[in-house]
């Protein structure tokens, strides 16, 4: 970590939980995690089949439209100005470049095009430019998703009016672990942005990252926060930490792969109608672990060889895996 002082340095504030949060207590979710592996996977697969085609997987493509230079100090992120990772700050992509990427994604079979920008919170003039990009993506018949940082209520409304279908804003981890991961944004601010997204009428995409040194109880706490949003997110990306040299979490102990599969299963059981997405970390997963994740209820992936600044399985590998497993595109 560099000597640069964090921007907007604040301490994590108390989390205001929706009254419906008692629907899933942390203890109840811990009990799911503790089930024998076969019993947990069987239960998750039962829930999955009640709501989805068990052999269909939705494909999204993620493009970094503005990379690096983020003032946040997230301990996992190579785009933070506080970490020396070699990621250079870029300007916002132009319409022609985004159009070309979206066309390639559609041709490869993606149905949703996600655009990510390394901002703490976009300025209104940034939103105006993103609106142009969204309209271009929508003109190609793709669903549009954005992840731009914190939003004001008017900004969320502007994105909705432009045609954004999903807005991603992750909780990252449980409230109890949050202060170890980031100090430049409080948990309540994340929840407030999610409320603005929901009020504007966009679908909520919200998940977190596992493998950051958290305990199982803290993983259960993250799932509880997600499941107790009212309603729960329509899309839930579950990321496994990708360790990047120069970030504070580089060199962390690896998460047991079966614990990752358990997290997928618990997310499926507690959020039965959500698309549970295998997100960052897939490149290092073996095919057998990915297959177990699909069995546990994962039904969405990021498709393409790059996720923002980190690697992802190439299209050919995914196509081969889908064929071996008999999976189709949702």
From Swiss-Prot:
Question: What does the organism's lineage look like at the top?
Answer: Bacteria, Pseudomonadati, Pseudomonadota, Betaproteobacteria, Burkholderiales
Organism source for this protein? Methylibium petroleiphilum (strain ATCC BAA-1232 / LMG 22953 / PM1)
Cofactor requirements of the protein:
[4Fe-4S] cluster; [2Fe-2S] cluster
Question: Which residues take part in binding [2Fe-2S] cluster?
Answer: 114, 145, 205, 277
One GO biological process term is:
biotin biosynthetic process
Which is an annotated GO molecular function term of this record? 4 iron, 4 sulfur cluster binding
Q: What is the protein's given name?
A: Biotin synthase
Please indicate if the UniProt record lists Iron-sulfur as a keyword.
yes
What does the record give as its pathway?
Cofactor biosynthesis; biotin biosynthesis; biotin from 7,8-diaminononanoate: step 2/2
Catalysed reactions, as listed in the record: (4R,5S)-dethiobiotin + (sulfur carrier)-SH + 2 reduced [2Fe-2S]-[ferredoxin] + 2 S-adenosyl-L-methionine = (sulfur carrier)-H + biotin + 2 5'-deoxyadenosine + 2 L-methionine + 2 oxidized [2Fe-2S]-[ferredoxin]
Show the InterPro entries listed in the entry: Aldolase_TIM (IPR013785), BATS_dom (IPR010722), Biotin_synth/BioAB (IPR002684), Biotin_synthase (IPR024177), Elp3/MiaA/NifB-like_rSAM (IPR006638), rSAM (IPR007197)
Query: Which UniProt keywords are present, listed alphabetically?
Result: 2Fe-2S, 4Fe-4S, Biotin biosynthesis, Iron, Iron-sulfur, Metal-binding, S-adenosyl-L-methionine, Transferase
Binding positions for [4Fe-4S] cluster per the UniProt entry: 70, 74, 77
């Amino acid at each position: 970590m560099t000597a640069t002082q964090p921007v907007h340095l604040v301490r994590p504030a108390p989390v205001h939980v929706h009254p419906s949060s008692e629907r899933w207590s942390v203890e109840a979710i811990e009990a799911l995690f503790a089930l024998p592996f076969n019993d947990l996977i069987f239960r998750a697969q039962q829930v999955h089949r009640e709501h989805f085609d068990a052999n269909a997987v939705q494909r999204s493509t993620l493009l970094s439209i503005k990379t690096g230079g983020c003032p946040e100090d997230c301990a996992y992120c190579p785009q933070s100005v506080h970490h020396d990772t070699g990621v250079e700050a870029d300007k916002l992509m132009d319409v022609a470049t985004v159009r070309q990427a979206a066309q390639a994604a559609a041709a490869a079979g993606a149905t949703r095009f996600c655009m990510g920008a390394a901002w703490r919170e976009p300025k209104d003039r940034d939103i105006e430019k993103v609106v142009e990009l969204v309209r271009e993506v929508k003109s190609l018949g793709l669903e549009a998703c954005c992840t731009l940082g914190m939003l004001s209520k008017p900004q969320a409304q502007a994105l909705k009016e432009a045609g954004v279908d999903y807005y991603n804003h992750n909780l990252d981890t449980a409230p109890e672990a949050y202060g170890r991961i980031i100090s430049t944004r409080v948990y309540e601010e994340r929840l407030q942005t999610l409320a603005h997204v929901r009020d504007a009428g966009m679908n909520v995409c919200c998940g977190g990252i596992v493998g950051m040194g958290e305990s199982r109880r803290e993983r259960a706490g993250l799932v509880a926060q997600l499941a107790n949003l009212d309603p729960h997110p329509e899309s839930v990306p579950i990321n496994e930490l990708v360790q990047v040299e120069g970030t504070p979490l580089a060199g962390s102990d690896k998460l047991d792969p079966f614990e990752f599969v358990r997290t997928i299963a618990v997310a499926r059981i507690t959020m039965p109608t959500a698309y549970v997405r295998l997100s960052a970390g897939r490149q290092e997963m073996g095919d057998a672990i990915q297959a177990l994740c699909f069995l546990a209820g994962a039904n969405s992936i990021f498709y393409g060889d790059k996720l923002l600044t980190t690697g992802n399985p190439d299209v050919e590998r995914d196509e081969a895996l889908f064929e071996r497993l008999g999976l189709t595109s949702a």
